[in-house]
């Protein structure tokens, strides 16, 4: 067919005050149903299964000048991180067992190796910048969706399978993945 009409909706530009903090995945699962998604107007969770941790990113609209608390990217959040990550992922194609170590290393270099409030990074940015995420690699992904309330069990099942958790592990759940 031929597209004959397009409707485009937009909102005026706005500024976001955002912060991100590293937590254990068990903390994410515990707070998922209660207040995780209500902490701010914008909330994202980046789950890193091999490290069993996640980053909670939350932001709220403000009227302040974006220069009041500018984002200071780490040295790893640029060309160095991009090239190191690409080369490690390339190597992991031939030595797949290093993938958990690659995740641990890249996560630690980009976000920090510790968890908790002391890992919080905060900034004020225009929304067009704040809502972007630097994955350090070109993304070609297959996205999928499930109802939000099923998120914790899906992630826990994947974690049990990926990390080969034993039934004696307190975070173990039957994953039902046959291989």
Task: List each model region and its residues.
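Noncatalytic alpha-helical scaffold of FAD-dependent oxidoreductases
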Residues: 1-179
């Amino acid at each position: 067919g031929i597209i004959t009409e397009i409707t485009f909706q937009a909102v005026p530009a706005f500024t976001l005050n955002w912060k991100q903090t590293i937590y254990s995945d068990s903390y994410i699962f515990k707070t998922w149903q209660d207040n995780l998604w209500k902490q701010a107007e914008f909330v994202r969770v980046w789950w890193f299964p091999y490290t069993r941790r996640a980053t909670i990113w939350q932001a709220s609209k403000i009227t302040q000048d974006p220069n009041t608390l500018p984002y200071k990217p780490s040295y790893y959040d640029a060309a160095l991180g991009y090239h190191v990550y690409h080369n490690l992922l390339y190597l992991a194609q031939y030595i797949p067992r290093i993938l958990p170590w690659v995740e641990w290393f890249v996560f630690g270099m980009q976000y920090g190796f510790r968890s908790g409030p002391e890992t919080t990074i905060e900034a004020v940015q225009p929304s067009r910048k704040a809502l972007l995420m630097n994955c350090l690699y070109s993304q070609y992904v297959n996205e999928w969706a499930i109802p939000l309330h099923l998120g914790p069990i899906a992630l826990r099942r994947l974690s049990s399978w990926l990390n080969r958790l034993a039934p004696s592990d307190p975070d173990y759940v039957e994953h039902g993945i046959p291989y």
